[in-house]
């Protein structure tokens, strides 16, 4: 399981500072939000920004969340052009279900994966991973899910089972923790809440999940680094514990 950062966690900081903060977390993997790579940048500016990120030793493993708002080739292509110039192998996205066949066509054309993100009870289109799965299960394999574990548990869904049921359609995962599994406002440092992080990681390993677990730390926006560092320490500790257990069993 590879741990990365969703740069939305660092939304109150400019790109150069966000890069330094990701480096401080000791991971090379970053899922970039448009606040750090604006959609309005010209292709050459996007390439330059991508080089700036890569020169710092970081790897762009995805971007988003990107909203496909219009069911037109022009609008959908704009975001794929953006993702291509930025070197994003995966676009974490949301869209009206009616737009997804068009998105699928561009995913095939550009050979870029699209991971539809579920946003919990407030999301009328995709509250839970199963709502995404229903839409993408017969589409091209590049169409899949980004399971947000915090939003998922708030729908009452068994998050470990949802990960298992998504199988190879699981393309990305947003990690966070909640003290109260029904309350969005109860987000906390990963490991201090009630989300079963250990069972989630165990399931990801059992299915040989090839994507990334990106920390999306939405609290403390003006000083997120201490909580993010604690979250990473906890997640690394869980992975180390699982590795020890695997060695003991073998």
Model-flagged regions — what are they?
Residues 31-54:
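Glycine-rich, proline-tolerant flexible connector loops at the mouths of alpha/beta enzymes
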Residues 16-19, 36, 52-147, 153-156, ...:
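Active-site acidic/histidine proton-transfer and metal-coordination neighborhood
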Residues 25-34, 58:
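Short, conserved active-site loops that position catalytic residues or coordinate cofactors/metal ions
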Residues 33, 66, 94, 176, ...:
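Conserved residues at the C-terminal ends of beta-strands
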Residues 35-40, 66, 184-188:
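Vicinal oxygen chelate
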Residues 1-3, 11-28, 126-147, 153-250:
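Histidine-acidic metal/acid-base catalytic patches
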Residues 1-15, 33, 62-67:
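Boundary/entry segment of secreted carbohydrate-active catalytic domains
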